[in-house]
Amino acid sequence: MSTFDNAVSIHPYFKVREGQLEACKSFLTRFNEKVAGEAKCLFYNFTFQGDVMCCREAYQDAEGVQAHLENVGALLGELLKIADLTRIELHGPAPELEKLKPVFAEMNPEYFICECGIGR
């Protein structure tokens, strides 16, 4: 079984508040340090287009996503003082996404169900 069979990726988009872009970029190293020890994290990085930031992240399964949220919850609260969450997408197999619906309900995410693909 590939580690990608149950993999879930999360794509939250943030609008960095005016004048906070450099502070936001500096803050991200704290996330990286915290996430580095997560056993079920497949990848975790940040991309930017102007003042819009996206965190590209994936986990082996829904359990890995839940562990991640517990790990970075306090940091996310701090980030939301300088950036606003504008959109969040969850991608993965339907059974794994179902497990996460109660966890993400208040964030009003868009769910994308994986129908086919390959993993290495």
Could you tell me what each predicted segment is?
Residues 73-74:
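Long, charge-enriched, surface-exposed interaction segments in small proteins/subunits
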Residues 1-54, 60-70, 81-120:
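Short S/T/G/P-rich N-terminal loop/turn motif that feeds into the first structured element of a domain
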